[in-house]
Amino acid sequence: MHIFITGIAGFLGSNLADYYLKKGFKVSGCDNLVGGSLDNIDQSKIKFYKINCEDLKSLSEAMKGVDIVCHAAAYAHEGL
């Protein structure tokens, strides 16, 4: 199974990526890197796309062949 995670370089997305890698999934995902960091993911095991979720054309292209999508992208702000 192949899972695509939006917001993959953030706290939630990167932990989901680790979980699914351990379960044997193929993992790919995107992040605009506004709040996330590439240091949070293992790029040797994860296909990473620097895409804003509002870029539907690029997002659609990156999701080709994906079985599951997990949407973890969000704008995070202190005090919410």
Residue ranges and their predicted role:
Residues 1-80:
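N-terminal Rossmann-like NAD(P)+-binding domain of SDR-like oxidoreductases, especially those catalyzing
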